[in-house]
Amino acid sequence: LGCLLGALDELVRGVDVSKIERVVLSTTLITNMIAEKKTDPVALVLIPGPGTNPRDYNLGPSIILDGAIDFRGKEIDWLNESQIKEAAARIKESGVSRVAVVGKFSQRNPAHEEKVSQIMSQILPGSKIELGHRVSGHLNFPRRAATTKLTLATKESYARFALAISRALEERRITAPVYILKADGGTLPLEGSLQMPVETIFSGPAASIMGVMALTPPGQTSVVVDIGGTTTDLALILSGSPLLSSKGARVDSMLTHVRAFAVRSVAIGGDSAVDVAEDCLTVGPQRNGSPFCLGGTGPTPTDALRVLGRSSVGDLERAKEAMAGVASRMNCTAEKAAEMVLDSVVEKIASQVNEMFREWEQEPAYRIWEIMKKEKLEAQNVVGVGGAAPALVPLIASRLKVASIVPEHAAVANAIGAAVARPTITLNLHIDTERGEYVTAEDGIMGKVNEKQMSLAQAEQLARRLLVERAGRLGIEEYAAEALVTSSEVFNMIRGWSTVGKLLDVRMEIPAGLLSSWRCT
């Protein structure tokens, strides 16, 4: 937070802060908390019903309860109250004060989750209890459980961060609305993000992708290579639109319901440690502090770039000293050692790009693009951002035999992307006319419908109204008019040779994109 506020003070020095129209943050807070195992402890209580053993879900320790709801929302097995009380007593004895309760198909009927919460809150007064259907109404029980657990594990720390940001801006008399960048490249008001902090994971790579969209010609198909100190993030822009991961963000080996770009992180960057063992040179994955040319203790790719004249960062003599140490163990010159370091970095990143292309080809959005375009995906460019991009990306592009683009302001593409990203939200509506009910997937809002033979047009109208209401709750109602229906389908339910109802599904979204009016100065 101190670094962020220091940068903010530099930015607003000599500026009339009353003219600031919006503040957008791209933060790695949640990412770092999860990576460093600094999240709050959570007791995970599952009501899985019949099917796959929940111990196979890779969700960590959990408590399993009896009871089941089917896919239509009908209770098919009852809860065991004594079992619930026993589970609550175990949680109390453990000292954990946060409980995530997640039942299979709870988004169709939350009665079991609510009953468990009611009983446990009496035995665990003061504990924070999060229910799965309120975090996500999407199908896929393991992902909803993972998302609920991570939401509760990060919510309090994120709230402290948001409060500190709000106070810091208030102290600086900055009254502009504050937004946070999400993993899908859209922004969300800071206050609205308090209920869904895990949405901000991977906002760093998302900001870089939005920055590339802003800094390169529209409609291009490009591989984005964001080279940082410790890692390099790879992403794909298809005809001007970033590719989203169909399975949601993967967090700490768990798939979640967080919408996110399809990004791969490679454990290599400008600060990666260079080592030699048995005449074999390795770069990364570990990082041992700053580059030697910047006062660090060991050689890095940044030192190699400095020796070869591809960068002006750091002290040249210290960089030469670092590469000389590598050269002595490889029996070559310092310049040759530097070339070998860069060749290793370029080869690792290029091979990861090729491997990720094979992964991208499995994404539904890519396959649809391939059908629509009637052509095989071939990147037109490799677009580099980050401090080391001007030096490394031309080499990576050459290895991949494509054009290289390092846009102006590439070093701050992340900040530009955050600044120009517009708000975005998604709403998935499921309607069961026989049961007379609807539910929204994003926040589990439920309601009644009276029309047994509801048409798709009526369903889309209801979805639009609910999206406008959700946008209002999140403080971005002015963008709701831009919402598009991206899919809608209906299934008739037949019983006894007669249609007894319909299942309708509608998806609407304010798509990710750039603000309509912006410029770099």
Identify what each model region corresponds to.
Residues 1-521:
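N-terminally biased helix-coil "hinge/interface" segments that flank
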